[in-house]
Every structure is written in C-alpha cells, then in structure tokens.
C-alpha cells in the first residue's frame, strides 16, 4: 500500500490534491503537511501535521516513521511574491527541492516524487503561441529561474541516481476553494470573488493579457494521472507542458457578464503585467497527451459557471 506525503497541503493545489489522493488511496495513507494550518476538510479528513520542508532532519524522521513511498512537494514562494523577496524565494524554492531530492535518493522506500514546474520557465524569447515542449527557456523572474533550475535538477537526479521525479509545467490554476496566493494568474480567481461580492473587479493585468489557464479539477486529475502512469511510457524526465485553455481578462469578464450582466471590470496593470508579458499565450501539450493521455473537462464557459456557483456557496451568498 502506498504511503503518500503531501508537502504544502494548505495551498491552492495541495488542499484539493489531498482530498483526491485520500479518495484513491485511503485517508489513513495520505499524510498532509504544511508550515501553517490547513483547511478543515484536510485536517479532519486524515493525518495532518505541521512540517517545515526546510528542516531536513525532521523531514527524514517523518518519512521513515510513516514509511512514506511517494512525495508530492508543492511548497513554494509563488511568482508575484517571489519578486518582492528574490533571494529568500530562491533559497526556499531551491533548498526545499534539494532536500526532497536527496531524501528520495537516500531512502529506498520512496519510489516516486511529484514536483510542480510552471509556464514561468518560459521567457520573452520563447515563442508565445503554441509554445512547444522543447523550446527556448530564458525566464526573467525569480520564480521562473528557480523552476527552470528545478527542472534541470530533477532530470539530473533521474539520470544520475534513478530518482523517479514527475513534473507538470502548470498554467494558471483556477479554484474557488482557496483564495489567491500571490501568483501572476491569480486575477482569474480574484475576479470571481469580487464579481460575487462587489459586482466589479479591478484587474492587475491588461484586458488583452492572454494566458493559459486550467480549472483545478483538471489539474489535479492530470497530476495524479501522471504519477500513476507507467514509467516506461514517459519520454521525458524534466517537466511536461500542459495547456489548459487560454483566455484574457476581457474574455473572462464577458463570460461572467452572461451570469451577472451588471458586472464591471477596470484595468490597472501593476508589476505582474511585465511577468505576464514574458509568458506564453498558449501551449502545445501534445507530448503529455501522447505519453500519458492528458485530457481536459473544462472550457471557459463551464469553468465560469462552476466558479460562480462555488464562490457563492463558499461566501454563503
């Protein structure tokens, strides 16, 4: 039986991933951890502990004590926040990954690791439309630089030590269950909360800032499907492109107005606009589709409907 450790279980991805993993593997076999308290359904639905991934000694004791066989390492300083504390963000993002890689190298029981990369690995010199799996990666953000370095490290550990690390270059992720957490694509979460609360939203990106996005349910399924795929089917051991759907704030606002006709949006781009300008507008994910059968359920219309329903329910409106 798999014993799974999720690091960063209080975050946007982790809080929903834990729920899905517990459905698949049994609640008692999925250990949720974070440096802060997680949502109630994570804490009450199975084992939860406060754990700092930067504390290597405590980490190895936890893994051995609970006979961990898989690790999902999701803890990170995200793109917008990383620009405010560049050296600290680099240190946290890289040292935490190296702690996990060294642990997986030394502990034979650990068979697989998941670590998320991001479209932030791309930069201004990358082809912006239908960005290929193999292309120019010259990121110009702290977050992107750390993700690109991480991609090289996970492939190195696979080739040198046989550590089976799997990774997805996530696009912007959209969920109503946890509010935004300092990322450049977080407008696509904030907009729904403000639409329901206030009937208007001030976007920190321009109206034509088209970016790849993905509804969280699709992202969680893709993550677990990749981890469950046969190793022999995987043609790469760095990080897979995953496209989701591409839209800009103007298009998303128009979709919201179909449900809330009086909704208004204004545009006041901040420092995150420059980050968005350096990222792809659309992604080619044909390699992921060929290797492990990547599929999507949500387009922009379905995503908008479910987000508005979910936010209203969460806010009790």
Placement of each model-derived feature along the sequence:
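N-terminal Rossmann NAD(P)H-binding glycine-rich loop of SDR-like oxidoreductase domains
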Residues: 4-23
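NAD(P)H-binding glycine-rich loop region in Rossmannoid oxidoreductase-like domains
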Residues: 53-92
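A conserved pocket-lining segment of Rossmann-fold NAD(P)-dependent short-chain dehydrogenase/reductase
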Residues: 82, 170-180, 190-214, 218
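Conserved Rossmann-fold NAD(P)-dependent oxidoreductase catalytic core, especially the SDR/UDP-sugar
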Residues: 98-141
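Conserved beta-loop-beta element that borders a ligand/cofactor-binding pocket
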Residues: 117-118, 151-177
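Flexible, glycine-rich beta-alpha linker
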Residues: 122-123, 141-142, 166-186
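Active-site helix of classical SDR
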Residues: 146
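C-terminal substrate-binding subdomain of Rossmann-fold SDR/epimerase-dehydratase oxidoreductases
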Residues: 204-206, 212-317
């Amino acid at each position: 039986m798999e014993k799974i450790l999720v690091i960063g279980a209080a975050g946007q991805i982790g809080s929903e991933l834990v729920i899905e993993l517990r459905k698949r593997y049994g609640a008692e076999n999925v250990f949720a951890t974070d440096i802060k308290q997680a949502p109630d359904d994570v804490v009450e639905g199975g084992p939860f502990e406060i754990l700092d991934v930067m504390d290597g000694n405590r980490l190895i004791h936890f893994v051995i004590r609970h006979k961990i066989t898989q690790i999902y390492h999701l803890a990170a300083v995200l793109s917008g926040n990383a620009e405010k504390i560049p050296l600290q963000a680099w240190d946290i993002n890289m040292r935490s990954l190296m702690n996990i890689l060294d642990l997986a190298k030394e502990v034979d029981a650990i068979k697989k690791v998941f670590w998320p990369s991001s479209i932030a690995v791309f930069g201004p010199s990358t082809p912006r439309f239908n960005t290929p799996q193999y292309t120019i990666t010259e990121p110009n953000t702290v977050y992107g630089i750390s993700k690109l370095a991480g991609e090289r490290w996970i492939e190195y550990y696979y080739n040198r030590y046989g550590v089976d690390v799997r990774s997805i270059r996530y696009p912007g992720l959209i969920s109503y269950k946890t509010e935004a957490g300092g990322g450049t694509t977080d407008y696509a979460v904030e907009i729904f909360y403000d639409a329901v609360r206030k009937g208007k939203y001030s976007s920190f990106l321009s109206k034509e800032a088209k970016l790849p996005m993905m509804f969280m349910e699709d992202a969680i399924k893709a993550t677990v499907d990749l981890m469950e795929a046969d190793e022999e089917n995987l043609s790469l051991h760095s990080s897979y492109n995953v496209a989701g759907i591409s839209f800009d704030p103007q298009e998303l606002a128009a979709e919201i107005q179909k449900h809330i006709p009086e909704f208004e949006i204004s545009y006041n781009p901040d420092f995150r606009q420059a980050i968005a300008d350096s990222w792809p507008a659309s992604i080619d994910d044909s390699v992921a589709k060929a290797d492990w059968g990547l599929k999507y359920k949500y387009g922009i219309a379905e995503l908008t409907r479910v987000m508005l329903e979910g936010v209203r329910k969460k806010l009790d409106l």
